[in-house]
């Protein structure tokens, strides 16, 4: 899966507005849209910070919407479900999403 495809899937699944993502990452909406739809990638210099911020936004939405089980079903091709206590759930989700975003970024940057 490409970076843009995975990002778009996360946005749709969590129903997160692009404006929220733009505010959290500090990037204009047009950049976010290009990442999702045009195959344009963030720079390698900034990707780790962007992925960390994005993963926290999505993990928070998943927990707040009580969609953890749905998330693991919908993203089973990218993220393996592991037993974790509810106290560490946000961190686990955030780390898993960040890792998956990084994998997709590497895959996309070599195409």
Residue ranges and their predicted role:
Residues 11, 22, 51, 55:
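The alpha-helix within a helix-turn-helix
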Residues 26-43:
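Recognition helix of helix-turn-helix/homeodomain-like DNA-binding domains
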Residues 24-31, 69-73:
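A short glycine/small-residue-enriched secondary-structure motif
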Residues 46-110:
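Short amphipathic recognition helices of helix-turn-helix/homeodomain-type DNA-binding modules
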Residues 1-18, 24:
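A short, Lys/Arg-rich alpha-helix, primarily the initiator
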Residues 7, 18, 29, 47, ...:
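Helix-turn-helix DNA-binding elements, focusing on the entry/boundary residues of the two helices
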């Amino acid at each position: 899966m490409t970076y843009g495809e995975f990002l778009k899937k996360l946005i749709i699944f969590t129903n997160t507005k692009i404006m929220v993502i733009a505010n959290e990452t500090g990037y204009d909406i047009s950049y976010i849209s290009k990442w999702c739809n045009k195959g344009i990638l963030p720079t390698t210099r900034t990707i780790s910070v962007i992925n960390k911020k994005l993963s926290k936004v999505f993990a928070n939405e998943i927990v707040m919407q009580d969609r953890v089980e749905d998330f693991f079903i919908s993203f089973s091709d990218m993220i393996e479900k592991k037993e974790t206590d509810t106290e560490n759930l946000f961190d686990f989700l955030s780390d898993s999403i960040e890792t998956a975003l990084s994998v997709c970024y590497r895959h996309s940057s070599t195409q």
